[in-house]
């Protein structure tokens, strides 16, 4: 067991979930693989120190409860306190899209990008129908399921989510400026950089940058050097604003530029036309003669790796993933997928 999780050995939470090993870190805490000792089922456990300066696991657990039942929303098993921790027990999921991008040597085919776009738009739309915006749309926060859910995309990490309208009155939050940037600068909308209160349009614009990240391998505002975080954010913002959508999307189907221009043109309170955006990509998908068969790029690679492993007389090295760019975290997240 890794030293980081050594102190958690024999740590049982919620009366029946025994921690096994650390499998990742969220924005505000560590995530562990755990086993339900009553039936052997594997689950994920998110731990947050009760001494955390900005505790948010209770808030996140409440949000998951509001979202329960939605397609691609993890099921919550238990929330409570154990020893010095706030604890959230939820479905165990597979690797993130960032992990899978690395697994595929940081190249996704257009077919994979378009199949993902369809599910990603639907996940964000569902959160919006529940009166919340996510505010941290990025590849790390989309995870594939496992087992019978292995082709289903899940949206996670609602610690930064915010209610944008009242459940009963449907009153939208007011337009404001001078807000600090919430979320991840690489994928943040231009308005978020400008300090404008986020709304539905910003989640959708962020998704546009995620899709172009997958298409291009990187975004023009990645890798900028600066002395401070604030200066780096300013450089990212400047580069993002000075890169025309047509330049960002050059060499890729026009639908990606259409998507981003549409999102950037939305008014603060305006509801995005999710079906229009899905149809943009669905029609492109059909035009390119692809079949919606859930055969993603990693599906093929996993099959190849399994065949290599089988034909290499049990030498585990042959089954290694085909890129040297992974972290140990990527490897651990790919196991059992």
Swiss-Prot record:
Limits of the Protein kinase domain: 17-285
Alphabetical keyword list: Acetylation, ATP-binding, Cell cycle, Cell division, Cell projection, Centromere, Chromosome, Cytoplasm, Cytoskeleton, Kinase, Kinetochore, Mitosis, Nucleotide-binding, Nucleus, Phosphoprotein, Serine/threonine-protein kinase, Transferase, Wnt signaling pathway
Active site annotation, chain numbering: 136 (proton acceptor)
One annotated Gene Ontology cellular component of this protein: beta-catenin destruction complex
Catalytic activities: L-seryl-[protein] + ATP = O-phospho-L-seryl-[protein] + ADP + H(+); L-threonyl-[protein] + ATP = O-phospho-L-threonyl-[protein] + ADP + H(+)
EC number, as in UniProt: 2.7.11.1
Modified residues (Phosphoserine): 4
Broad enzyme group: transferase
One Gene Ontology MF term: protein serine/threonine kinase activity
Subunit structure: Interacts with the Axin complex. Interacts with TUT1, leading to TUT1 phosphorylation. Interacts with FAM83A, FAM83B, FAM83C, FAM83D, FAM83E, FAM83F, FAM83G and FAM83H (via DUF1669). Interaction with FAM83H recruits CSNK1A1 to keratin filaments.
The protein's name: Casein kinase I isoform alpha
Gene symbol of the encoding locus: CSNK1A1
């Amino acid at each position: 067991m890794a030293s980081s999780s050594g102190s958690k050995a024999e740590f049982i939470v919620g009366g029946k979930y025994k921690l096994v090993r650390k499998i990742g870190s969220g924005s505000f805490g560590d995530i562990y693989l755990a086993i339900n000792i009553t039936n052997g089922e594997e689950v994920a456990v998110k731990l947050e120190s009760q001494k955390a300066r900005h505790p948010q696991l209770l808030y996140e657990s409440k949000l998951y409860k509001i979202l329960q039942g939605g397609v691609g929303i993890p099921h919550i098993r238990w929330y409570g306190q154990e020893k010095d921790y706030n604890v959230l027990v939820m479905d165990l999921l597979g690797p993130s899209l960032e992990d899978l991008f690395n697994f595929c040597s940081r190249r996704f085919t257009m077919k994979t990008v378009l199949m993902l776009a369809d599910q990603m738009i639907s996940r964000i739309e569902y959160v919006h129908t529940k009166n919340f915006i996510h505010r941290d749309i990025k590849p790390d926060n989309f995870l594939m399921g496992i087992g019978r859910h292995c082709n289903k995309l899940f949206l996670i990490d609602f610690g930064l989510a915010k209610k944008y309208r009242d459940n009963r009155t449907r009153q939208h939050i007011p337009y404001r400026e001078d807000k600090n940037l919430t979320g991840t600068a690489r994928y943040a909308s231009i308005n978020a950089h400008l300090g404008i209160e986020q709304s539905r349009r910003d989640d959708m614009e962020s998704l546009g940058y995620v899709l172009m990240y997958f298409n291009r391998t990187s975004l023009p505002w990645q890798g900028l050097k600066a002395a401070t975080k604030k200066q780096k954010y300013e450089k990212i913002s400047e580069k993002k604003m000075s890169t025309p959508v047509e330049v960002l999307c050059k060499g890729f189907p026009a639908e990606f530029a259409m998507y981003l221009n549409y999102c950037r043109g939305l008014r603060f309170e305006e509801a995005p036309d999710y079906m229009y955006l899905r149809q943009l990509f669905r029609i492109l998908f059909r035009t390119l003669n692809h079949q919606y068969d859930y055969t993603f790029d990693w599906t093929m690679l996993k099959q190849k790796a399994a065949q290599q492993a089988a034909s290499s007389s049990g030498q585990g090295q042959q089954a290694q993933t085909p890129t040297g760019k992974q972290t140990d975290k990527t490897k651990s997240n790919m196991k059992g997928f």
